[in-house]
Amino acid sequence: MSRVPSPPPPAEMTSGPVAESWCYTQIKVVKFSYMWTINNFSFCREEMGEVIKSSTFSSGANDKLKWCLRVNPKGLDEESKDYLSLYLLLVSCPKSEVRAKFKFSILNAKGEETKAMESQRAYRFVQGKDWGFKKFIRRDFLLDEANGLLPDDKLTLFCEVSVVQDSVNISGQNTMNMVKVPDCRLADELGGLWEHSRFTDCSLCVAGQEFQAHKAILAARSPVFSAMFEHEMEESKKNRVEINDVEAEVFKEMMFFIYTGKAPNLDKMADDLLAAADKYALERLKVMCEDALCTSLSVENAAEILILADLHSADQLKTQAVDFINYHASDVMETSGWKSMVASHPHLVAEAYRSLASAQCPFLGPPRKRLKQS
């Protein structure tokens, strides 16, 4: 659910004249999504104009607005008989009306959104009213196995809804002597110390390259570096650390994160950076890598990512990988990565099977939630 942000200081709202008084209006919008899977879709016997409805859903437990999706598998009328028709229906509403935008898509065999269609404006809904698309997708295209829209004869529809709520006005008065507090540049300034090797007091040797750093910053950010410098270890005595199992480019990205909290090249090296983050106990960087790897999950790499997650105790990534494998089990088990995992990591194969067996109902789709970052 979106929140009303604090209004920007008047001086930041415009570079032109500053008025004596001002008002900031925020239109509140609640956004939520819903996924509906229809099993054995090709066996639908509904005739033209007949309807299948989903269960009701809302944005949360306390939301009194109830919605559902409505599908006409063989079209709504003669004009749309060769299409699947799809609508969003307002089932119950305590108000006289609400306005909402919506977007429909189909999840393909890889869990990717395809064939998306969305409303061009916020439509007016009253209880019992629906809006949608009479010609959402041609039936022959949908049923063609080559298009991959019905894996295991399952049609998975994904709906995103944006409900317009009340607007909020925040107003105030300007004073003649406005003070603008500068933005905090701590991350940039610490990053400059790293990039320009200023006032350094230790050396880090990585793959034959020497990097200059600051013991205090390394110790504050990483418990592993802290232990090196705090105790009477060789690194503490010589102010020199040998790092043998991290590539130079990965190490530089890790150090940039240590100094700035940012990792601009993370997507290019998420697997190697995950290993480095695990070794040096950089928990936030580790979860950032898990999140990036979750977005790259595919049938081809799911087994490799599961092995990586298990090796580095990346629990959130491991859960997502197991769920993905369960959803795409028949395809994943044909890959070389899975066959290799069967031989090298049989305990992970057993975990995946236990997870699938313990499910109370068929898994409806790949997880879409963000990972929790510490």
From Swiss-Prot:
Source taxon at top rank: Eukaryota
Protein family (similarity comment): Belongs to the Tdpoz family.
GO biological process terms, semicolon-separated: proteasome-mediated ubiquitin-dependent protein catabolic process; protein ubiquitination; regulation of proteolysis
Major location category of this protein: nucleus
Domain BTB: 173-297
One matching Pfam family: BACK_BPM_SPOP
Region (Homodimerization): 297-355
Any GO molecular function: ubiquitin protein ligase binding
Alphabetically ordered keywords of this record: Nucleus, Ubl conjugation pathway
UniProt remark on domains: The BTB (POZ) domain mediates dimerization and interaction with CUL3. The MATH domain mediates interaction with protein-ubiquitin ligase substrates.
Subunit (UniProt): Homodimer. Part of cullin-RING-based BCR (BTB-CUL3-RBX1) E3 ubiquitin-protein ligase complexes that contain CUL3 and SPOP, plus a target protein.
Domain MATH: 31-161
Protein name (database record): Speckle-type POZ protein
Localization: Nucleus; Nucleus speckle
Pathway info: Protein modification; protein ubiquitination
InterPro entries reported in the protein's UniProt record: BACK_BPM_SPOP, BTB/POZ_dom, MATH/TRAF_dom, SKP1/BTB/POZ_sf, SPOP_C, TRAF-like
Keyword hit for Nucleus: yes
Function, as annotated: Component of a cullin-RING-based BCR (BTB-CUL3-RBX1) E3 ubiquitin-protein ligase complex that mediates the ubiquitination of target proteins, leading most often to their proteasomal degradation.
GO cellular component, one term: nuclear speck
Positions of the UniProt region annotated as Required for nuclear localization: 71-191
